[in-house]
């Protein structure tokens, strides 16, 4: 094994260990995808009707699933029909056909493990309102886990088995693909650095651990996988062999059925295959290379058309066409897209709420270096491609009505484009090493805090962690949520804001009732003390955020529930505490010390890579 190959192996081990280290718990996005994985493996079908409602046995026993048929289910002899819910809590029956007498409407978002669902009326089946690529990627790992557990007599619906299986599925799909992508990033970075190892290694580690790619490499979402597959397509399309070009097309095609938006970068890569000069000769269209690349894309186009026809009745119908009306804006293109917003552009670039350059300041140098690439004739083609891919995802984000991305540790819709903004960092680490290194350290610290506490950061989105009197721009994911939870065990900045708003309302009620000012002050003081003491104890009322307890792995939601309401298990129970976890917590549960193995293994290996690559340069 050569020195470079050893470095690549160490990069893979360091990143895979880190991405596999965290289980981030449940949430709408990953719960719906995992339901499809289970349906494929356990039932051999795509419909997830039997994997969206979980109940506990009478007397507080194990979990069991409640099957649905045409959006209806039965509990204790009572028939219920699931209903969409709008912001005014109006119920709209999902199945609009006449209901039998005595059937009660039930709000879907309270009962189902996810609200990210689509219901197909002509089949009576539920599906995730997502592209299927992520689910397909998760099938191999879950297939192995499920059949091993079945041979051992384990119940896949048991809380701990379900939780572990979701973790294993995430590791064997998103975690693995993301780590492999880091190796390919390292190879591309070496090419763009002229073979220099240190700038390439530093850029790779800054990308892996200092950008929003890190937390999303630990989640069963599509974003890190899409970015990884597009990066892999870019790597292979730069090779000359027909096999590599086919593989480039396959990676691109898989990216497109993992995130439909990736179809546009797939076209950009086709243009690159057609026009790029890989051997330094004069530019001319290479239709052979492009045809081979597109031949690799074709099977995935056929696959998605077949999937859509089977599940939705037409190759051109998508799951989004059948999702909740809550996600649709009647005045928007495709129900989701509006004119680009300069305010959102500011939010996702420089704000402490979703700002890519605030949360990952090292990418400031990536953007600056991309400009330098554009001025360099030898790199101009690649620079234009990187700019086009990242710029496309940026444009989509600032035009999307759900720009914030829900519960998220950063601008998640930019994650698929991050590899292409980070690749130019090889220039920054070569020319401005100390400045870029300092910004990288700040970036890694931010991303580690966000990943170690909750990669699905709910600040300013979740009703339990939102102050409606504040603009999005003034919210701070790290300063108001991740850091206070890690350092003090509670998100005190937001809790204090919620307490202040609550007491203002209570004081207004007292004043309206004619209570004298001195008495109002006394009562409000007592109320403030009692409520603060309740938050210290972790009580969930009146502030649900008070039940969110640090310092690490704070998400109490499981893969069997869709909302933070502790319907299955009470706050601070063993189950809610272990719905999310990191590997170190098997030794130091609920402790900052749980990060020590991560710092020693991944941190030590990263240090070794940097030192070894610097020695090679010397």
Segments predicted by a language model, with ranges:
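Start-transfer (signal-anchor) and selected internal transmembrane alpha helices
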Residues: 1-19, 170, 180, 286-296, ...
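Signature aromatic-anchored transmembrane alpha helix within multi-pass, membrane-resident enzymes
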Residues: 5-12, 294-298, 302, 379-391, ...
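Transmembrane-helix signature of polytopic, membrane-embedded enzymes
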Residues: 6-10, 150-160, 180-209, 227-228, ...
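Membrane-interface alpha helices of multi-pass inner-membrane proteins
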Residues: 37, 203-204, 208, 236, ...
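Membrane-lumen/periplasm interface segments of multi-pass, membrane-embedded glycan/lipid transferases
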Residues: 102-123, 285-287, 305, 309-373, ...
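Membrane-interface transmembrane helices that cradle and orient dolichyl/undecaprenyl
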Residues: 193, 223, 233-246, 277-281
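Perimembrane helix-loop-helix junctions
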Residues: 236-239, 264-302, 367-378, 423
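Hydrophobic, aromatic-rich transmembrane alpha-helices
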Residues: 357-380, 384, 421-427, 433-441, ...
């Amino acid at each position: 094994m050569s020195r470079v190959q050893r470095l690549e192996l160490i990069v893979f081990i360091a990143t895979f260990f880190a991405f596999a280290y965290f289980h981030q718990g449940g949430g709408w996005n990953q719960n719906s995808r995992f339901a499809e994985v289970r349906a494929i493996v356990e039932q051999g079908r795509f419909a997830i009707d039997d994997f969206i409602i979980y109940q506990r046995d009478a007397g507080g026993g194990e979990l069991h699933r409640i099957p649905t048929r045409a959006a209806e289910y039965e509990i204790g002899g009572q028939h219920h029909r699931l209903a969409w819910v709008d912001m005014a809590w109006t119920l709209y029956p999902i199945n609009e056909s006449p209901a039998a007498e005595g059937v009660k409407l039930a709000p879907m978002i309270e009962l189902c493990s996810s609200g990210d669902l689509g219901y197909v009326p002509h089949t009576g089946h539920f599906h995730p309102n997502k592209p299927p690529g992520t689910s397909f990627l998760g099938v191999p790992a879950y297939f192995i886990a499920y059949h091993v557990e079945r041979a051992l007599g384990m119940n896949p619906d048991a809380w701990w088995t379900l939780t572990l299986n979701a973790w294993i599925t995430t590791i064997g799909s998103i975690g693995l693909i993301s780590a492999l992508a880091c190796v390919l990033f390292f190879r591309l970075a070496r090419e763009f650095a002229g073979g220099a190892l240190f700038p390439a290694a530093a850029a790779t580690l800054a990308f892996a651990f200092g950008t929003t790619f890190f937390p999303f490499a630990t989640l069963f979402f599509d974003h890190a996988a899409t970015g990884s597959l597009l990066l892999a397509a870019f790597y292979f399309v730069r090779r000359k062999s027909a096999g590599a070009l086919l593989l480039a097309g396959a990676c691109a095609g898989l990216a497109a059925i993992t995130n439909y938006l990736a179809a546009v970068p797939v076209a950009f890569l086709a243009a690159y295959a057609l026009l790029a000069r890989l051997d330094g000769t004069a530019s001319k269209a290479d239709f052979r290379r492009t045809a081979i690349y597109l031949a690799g894309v074709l099977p995935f186009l056929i696959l998605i058309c077949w999937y859509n026809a089977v599940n939705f009745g037409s190759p051109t119908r998508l799951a989004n066409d059948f999702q909740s009306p809550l996600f649709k804006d009647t005045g928007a293109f495709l129900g989701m897209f509006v004119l680009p917003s300069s305010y959102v552009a500011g939010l996702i670039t420089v704000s402490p709420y979703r700002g890519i350059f605030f949360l990952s300041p090292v990418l400031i140098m990536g953007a600056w270096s991309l400009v330098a690439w554009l001025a360099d004739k030898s790199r101009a083609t690649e620079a234009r491609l990187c700019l086009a891919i990242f710029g496309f995802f940026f444009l989509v984000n600032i035009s999307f009505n759900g720009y914030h991305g829900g519960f998220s540790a950063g601008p998640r819709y930019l994650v698929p484009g991050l590899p292409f903004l980070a690749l130019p960092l090889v220039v920054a680490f070569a020319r401005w090493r100390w400045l870029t290194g300092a910004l990288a350290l700040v970036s890694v610290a931010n991303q580690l805090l966000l990943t170690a506490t909750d990669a699905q950061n709910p600040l300013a989105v979740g009703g339990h962690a939102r102050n409606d009197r504040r603009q999005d721009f003034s919210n701070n994911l790290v300063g108001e949520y991740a850091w206070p939870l890690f350092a003090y065990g509670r998100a005190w900045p937001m809790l204090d804001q919620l307490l202040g708003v609550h007491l203002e309302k209570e004081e207004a009620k007292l004043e309206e009732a004619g209570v004298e000012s001195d008495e109002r002050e006394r009562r409000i003081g007592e109320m403030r003390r009692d409520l603060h003491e309740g938050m210290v104890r972790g009580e969930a009322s009146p502030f649900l955020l008070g039940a969110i307890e640090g310092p690490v792995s704070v998400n109490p939601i499981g893969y069997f529930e869709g909302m933070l309401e502790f319907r299955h298990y009470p706050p601070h129970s063993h189950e809610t505490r272990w719905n999310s976890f990191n590997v170190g917590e098997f030794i130091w549960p609920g402790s900052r010390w749980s990060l020590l193995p991560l710092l020693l293994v991944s941190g030590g290996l990263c240090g070794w890579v940097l030192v070894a690559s610097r020695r090679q340069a010397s």
